[in-house]
Structures are given as structure tokens and as C-alpha cells.
A protein has these predicted regions:
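Phosphate/nucleotide-binding beta-alpha loop and adjacent structural elements of enzyme active sites
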Residues: 1-259
């Protein structure tokens, strides 16, 4: 009921604004929240965390569609590339008990939140392998940036960017690895979610062998400025778009026939 009330247009703006000021003032902006049966460690100052707290969901259309395809196609691995606070990984572990999940998150603050959530959801510990590095086309440290708002460096939207943007961004270096070298998967059925804020092509180049040697459904966020490059690369590997959620730039590809 509260999540429905919070979605009313005027309250959708008013509630977060008031809550941010109060929680920051008393120093209680982070902690554990029960989100549809999952205990998640979240920070109200982070916009994605805040959406999960207020509405008990995030990218619900994408997650429900992805879960239905994993079940329908009997996929046995889920790769969460850009896992952030772990919402996708935890939801999929909750809904599909026998799936193997690899979660990759280079931002140390996001990794910290996800790790604390895993401690409170012990039943998923055998399903989820969480790594504190990102995927790319080379093994190296890369400079990342996060937007600072309300004095907090937001974990959602962290980008790989070698150039300094502004003083309103927090800069840090994070570890990245070539996905193919870490995973070494072949002849399996995979679901892959990639949400890496412009680093998509680098991730895909590092996963070329994995994408070639497995049946895959791929959910990838692609912004307009690099859509053509990413789409051309995936087309070259034999992947076709079969579903789109345009308002959030999320595209679903597969390299096998979707009925």
C-alpha cells in the first residue's frame, strides 16, 4: 500500500526530498530493508537504492521478463555484469533456486552493500559468486567516476572515464578483467545482464569466446550514442534483438531462436 501511495506524482517528488534531509540529519540513511522477501542493505541517498526502498522494485519489467525467459529456456547460468547493490542477482536467486550466478561489481561501495545483503540471505550464498572487479577487454585498473549528490558518491551510474568530468564527481580506480579468461564457459545456456554505463563494447570484446560458445540471452543497456557499434558487433556474432524496453534503453538479444 505504501509503495503505491509513494508513486503518486506529487508524493513521488516530495517524499524522497523530505526523507533524504531527515535521514541525513540523523545519520540513518543506510541499513537493512525487507524487499519482497529479500533483506537488502541499502542507502537512501543513492537514487537506485531509494527507488527500491520506496517502491519495492527496480526495473521490474526487465527483471520479470528475464526471469520468465530463464525459466522458459532452462538457462543454467546468470552473469550480472555491473551488479551494483545486487538487486538483479538476488531477485533471480530468489526465483530460480538451481541457477549459478556470477556477479561483477568494480565499485567498492556497491560491492560493500551487495556483500552485506548476501550475509543476510545465506540461502543464496551457494548460488551467487560475487566479485569486486568489472569486466572489460583487458586486465587492468581503470579510472571510474561516480556522481556526488547530498554529499554521497552514488553507486548507480558509475562510469569508466579516463578524463575528469567535474568536482561533482568522485574519482577512483577499480580492477577489471577479461571475462573469457575468468569464466571459461562453453556449451552452456546463459543469461547475461550488462549495465555498465557506456563500457558495453569493451565488456563484449572480453566475452567474445563466451558469447560464441554458449547459447545466450543477453540484456544490455545501450545508449543511443554507441548503439550502432554495439549492435553491429553483436550482429557479427550472430545475435538478434527479440525484445526492447525503450524507455530505459534495455535491449534483449539472443543467438538462438526465441519462440
Amino acid at each position: 500500500m505504501l509503495s503505491k501511495i509513494a508513486k503518486l506524482p506529487i508524493l513521488k517528488r516530495l517524499i524522497p526530498s523530505l526523507a533524504i534531509r531527515i535521514l541525513k540529519l540523523i545519520g540513518k540513511n543506510r541499513g537493512y530493508y525487507s524487499i519482497r522477501g529479500i533483506n537488502m542493505y541499502l542507502d537512501f541517498l543513492d537514487p537506485i537504492d531509494r527507488e527500491i526502498i520506496l517502491f519495492n522494485e527496480f526495473e521490474n519489467l526487465e527483471i520479470e521478463f528475464l526471469i520468465s525467459e530463464i525459466k522458459r529456456k532452462k538457462l543454467n547460468y546468470f552473469l550480472d555484469v555491473g551488479a551494483n547493490c545486487g538487486y538483479y542477482s538476488l531477485k533471480i536467486a530468489q526465483k530460480i533456486s538451481n541457477i549459478n550466478i556470477f556477479s561483477f561489481e568494480p565499485n567498492p561501495e556497491a560491492y560493500h552493500k551487495f556483500s552485506k545483503s548476501l550475509l543476510k540471505n545465506f540461502e543464496f550464498s551457494n548460488n551467487i559468486k560475487l566479485e569486486n572487479f568489472g569486466l572489460s577487454n583487458e586486465n587492468k585498473k581503470l579510472k571510474m567516476q561516480s556522481m556526488i549528490k547530498f554529499g554521497y558518491a552514488q553507486t548507480g551510474g558509475s562510469t569508466v572515464n579516463e578524463k575528469s568530468i567535474s568536482e561533482k564527481h568522485h574519482e577512483f580506480f577499480a580492477n577489471f578483467k577479461i571475462g573469457d579468461e575468468y569464466l571459461n564457459l562453453s556449451n552452456n545456456n546463459l543469461a547475461i545482464k550488462i549495465d555498465v554505463e557506456g563500457h558495453e563494447l569493451n565488456v563484449l570484446h572480453g566475452l567474445k569466446k563466451t558469447l560464441d560458445s554458449n547459447k545466450c540471452i543477453l540484456q544490455i543497456e545501450i545508449f543511443n550514442n554507441n548503439f550502432k557499434e554495439v549492435d553491429n558487433f553483436l550482429s557479427y556474432l550472430g545475435y538478434n534483438i527479440f525484445y526492447v524496453i525503450k524507455k530505459r534503453s534495455n535491449y534483449f538479444y539472443s543467438n538462438f531462436k526465441i519462440n
